[in-house]
């Protein structure tokens, strides 16, 4: 496990379903404990409703205003605010307005961040390719 920051290592990048992912800390660097990435999401964009069965997720909004749907309840989250999305709970979000939003995501345990790189490389789409996802 590499516990020191490595400024010479560039973040891994992936663009999947119109969202740009910049993975700044992955499972390799953390020994599987966490995954950290910054996402740039298009205006009015966001993922379909989904569930993480193994990972807890914390999202901090850096730019824009988001609306999160978490287990049937709507939570507005503005720049500078955070939300916790526990594993096993259906959720989604969308960026409010036409301008892109940026958020920092922390997943624990790590590993799911690699999903975005693989999904982008395979050009998988949701919900069309849900069986492959």
Sequence positions of predicted segments:
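Acidic/histidine-enriched, glycine/proline-rich intrinsically disordered or flexible terminal extensions
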Residues: 117-133
């Amino acid at each position: 496990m590499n516990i020191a920051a490595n400024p010479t290592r560039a973040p891994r990048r992936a663009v999947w379903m119109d969202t740009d992912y910049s993975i700044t800390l992955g499972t390799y660097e953390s020994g599987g404990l966490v995954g950290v990435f910054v996402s740039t999401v298009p205006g009015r964009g966001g993922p379909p409703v989904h569930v993480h069965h193994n990972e807890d997720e914390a999202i901090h909004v850096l730019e824009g205003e988001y609306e999160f749907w978490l287990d049937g309840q709507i939570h507005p989250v503005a720049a500078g605010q955070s939300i916790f999305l526990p594993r096993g709970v259906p959720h989604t979000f969308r960026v409010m307005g036409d301008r892109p939003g940026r958020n920092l995501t922390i997943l624990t345990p790590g590993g799911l961040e690699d999903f975005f790189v693989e999904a982008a490389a395979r050009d998988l789409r949701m919900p069309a390719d849900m069986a492959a996802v």
